[in-house]
């Protein structure tokens, strides 16, 4: 029997893809010019629920699955997992020597949630968590969800002006932090914004610059004007406070906002993407299903997480995936440390490892890399920025991570929308960010016309589905510019889709270099330079040029002990890539400006290069 679902779906989406121009633009066109004619009926044999295919030779795809989305809160998910696996190890904080099983974790989370309510925080209040990876971070993440409080994930590297910006933006009522980490003096930084703190009654702060902030909580030291987290958890253990928590939970909805995740700031001021229980619970459920977690034993579910918890990869892909699927979450260090990640794998028999490309490069380059035991590790996740094919191959071959998957997502999409299957081939993993996730739609559109592109033709990637954020907190206009009435989230990423539905990210629309009218995608050149035997890493940016508009600048980091010249690099390019893609400038660098989550800040790199080149 012929299945016409794809044609009907495509017809609706083709209209939606036009964004602000609306459906009338499409409907008024002469029928001969409509790409709708190219969509043919799909036979039932062509409909694949596990690996859906693009429709009609165009870059639109919809993810299918036999499982339904769930309408549960984070707290309900933790309760269910604790009931199923009470004695299974849930959380191991190696640098704090903390180990909890799921029953113990649930008990502590309930007490913390109850304690937060007992000090006057209420459903919908915003509570910032500011600090490195720690037991307190996981506790606050889960406790706020249990209590209906909105967690605000604050970058642990923020200084006073950045901190003031995010706390004011979302109207934080409270903030939690350790006294210090390395050179970061959290209490002193907050005092720069709130000099009133030192003399304030704990829990009753009145700040001129942060009028919403009343409650400051210290994780590890009694400090003037603050409440101590241990005292709050202890108070939460009282039966009357736990009873109040249970009463409050009757009024929680899975559609309530649970978390404000600030974008990484690779292009300017961060925006507060607001995510609900429904967003996060379902994304973590589907990530775990794609990783085959429901089929694995406790010994096969030991997830090593060196990534920061303030970022979606850590808090959703790490903490929530573990809580949903009964995996053991192993935090290897307070901030990223390649050696500590290797120690966690070796000593704790880690089976999964998460990280960004930059983190994996550092792990592979540890001087004593070969001394670690990789017999337990099977796979993991690489995400956060484009991963060069050579790096994917090195991880799989050198670390025994045959089930490694490449993941693509954005904070605004909760975050994962494309992901490999563990059984995908090495070439499929090295050449793409995987396939569409279930219950998610994706399309690639021409940035100038708004029409769907043909397969294997670059355009801007749009996403639609349950995963799309509720909006940017307090910024309705920016929300509408990003998620229009058609409900498509415009990623700003340039991508292409192949016949099997694999997606490849070729760059950011803002990073695309226009040199003398030619469009050049940095990711293509960055992958190319990694074929040079002496190149460890490459980043390509466009720098200003009076004649061409922009010129190409390749910022190259060489392998340890290697040397070469700009002339040799250019000679390597000749005959292998188009002449107009050969960089005018080759600059050798020791590193790149990074966000705390490991993403390269191209706009800062561009500024540095223009200064260096005196442009």
Curated annotation (Swiss-Prot):
Major location category of this protein: mitochondrion
Tagged with keyword Lipid metabolism: yes
Catalyses which reaction(s): a medium-chain fatty acid + ATP + CoA = a medium-chain fatty acyl-CoA + AMP + diphosphate; octanoate + ATP + CoA = octanoyl-CoA + AMP + diphosphate
Enzyme class: ligase
Transit peptide: 1-41
One cellular component term from this protein's GO annotations in UniProt: mitochondrion
Family, per entry: Belongs to the ATP-dependent AMP-binding enzyme family.
Protein name listed in UniProt: Medium-chain acyl-CoA ligase ACSF2, mitochondrial
Taxonomic source organism: Mus musculus
Lineage: Eukaryota, Metazoa, Chordata, Craniata, Vertebrata
């Amino acid at each position: 029997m012929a299945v016409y679902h794809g044609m009907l779906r495509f017809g609706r989406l083709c209209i939606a893809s036009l964004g602000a121009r609306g459906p009338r633009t499409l409907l008024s066109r002469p029928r001969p010019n409509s790409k709708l004619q190219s969509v043919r009926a799909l036979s039932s044999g062509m409909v694949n629920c596990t690996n859906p295919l693009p429709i009609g030779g165009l870059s639109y795809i919809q993810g299918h699955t036999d499982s339904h989305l769930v309408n549960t809160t984070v707290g309900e998910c933790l309760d269910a997992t604790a009931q199923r696996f009470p004695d299974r190890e849930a959380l191991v904080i190696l640098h704090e020597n903390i180990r909890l099983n799921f029953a113990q974790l649930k008990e502590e989370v309930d007490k913390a949630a109850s304690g937060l309510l007992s000090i006057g925080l209420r459903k919908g209040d915003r509570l910032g968590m500011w600090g490195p990876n720690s037991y307190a971070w996981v506790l606050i993440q889960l406790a706020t969800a249990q209590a209906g409080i909105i967690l605000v994930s604050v970058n642990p590297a923020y200084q006073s002006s950045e901190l003031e910006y995010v706390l004011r933006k979302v109207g934080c009522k409270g903030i939690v932090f350790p006294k210090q980490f390395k050179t970061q003096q959290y209490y002193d930084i907050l005092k720069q914004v709130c000099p009133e703190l030192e003399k304030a009654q704990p829990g009753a702060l009145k700040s001129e610059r942060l009028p919403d902030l009343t409650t400051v909580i210290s994780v590890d030291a009694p400090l003037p004007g603050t409440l101590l987290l241990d005292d709050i958890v202890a108070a939460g253990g009282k039966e009357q406070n736990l009873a109040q928590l249970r009463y409050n939970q009757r009024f929680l909805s899975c559609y309530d906002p649970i978390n404000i995740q600030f974008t990484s700031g690779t292009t300017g001021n961060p925006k507060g993407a607001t995510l609900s229980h429904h967003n996060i619970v379902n994304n973590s459920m589907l990530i775990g299903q794609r990783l085959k977690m429901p089929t694995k034993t406790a010994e096969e579910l030991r997830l090593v997480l060196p990534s920061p918890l303030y970022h979606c990869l850590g808090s959703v892909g790490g903490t929530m995936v573990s809580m949903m699927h009964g995996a053991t979450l192993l935090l290897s260090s307070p901030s990223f440390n390649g050696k500590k990640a290797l120690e966690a794998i070796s000593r704790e028999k880690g089976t999964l490892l998460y990280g960004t490309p930059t983190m994996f490069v550092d792990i592979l380059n540890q001087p004593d890399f070969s001394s670690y035991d990789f017999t337990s590790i099977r796979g993991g996740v690489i995400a956060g920025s484009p991963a060069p094919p050579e790096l994917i191959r090195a991880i799989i071959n050198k670390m025994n991570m045959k089930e490694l998957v490449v993941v693509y997502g954005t904070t605004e999409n909760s975050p994962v929308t494309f992901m490999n299957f563990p059984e995908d081939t090495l070439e499929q993993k090295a050449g793409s960010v995987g396939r569409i996730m279930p219950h998610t739609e994706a399309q690639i559109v021409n940035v100038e016309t708004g029409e769907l592109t043909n397969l294997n033709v670059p355009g801007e990637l749009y996403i639609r589905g349950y995963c799309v954020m509720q909006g940017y907190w307090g910024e309705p206009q920016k929300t509408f510019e990003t998620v229009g009435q058609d409900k498509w989230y415009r990623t700003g990423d340039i991508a292409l889709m192949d016949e099997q539905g694999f997606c490849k990210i070729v760059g950011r629309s803002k990073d695309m270099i226009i040199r003398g009218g030619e469009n050049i995608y940095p990711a293509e050149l960055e992958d190319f330079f990694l074929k040079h035997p002496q190149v460890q890493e490459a980043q390509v940016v466009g720098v200003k040029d009076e004649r061409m508009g922009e010129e190409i600048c390749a910022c190259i980091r060489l392998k340890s002990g290697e040397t070469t010249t700009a002339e040799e690099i250019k000679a390597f390019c000749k005959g292998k890539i188009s002449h107009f893609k050969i960089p005018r400038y080759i600059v050798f660098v020791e590193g790149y400006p990074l966000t705390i989550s490991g993403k390269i800040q191209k706009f800062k790199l561009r500024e540095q290069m223009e200064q260096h080149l005196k442009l």
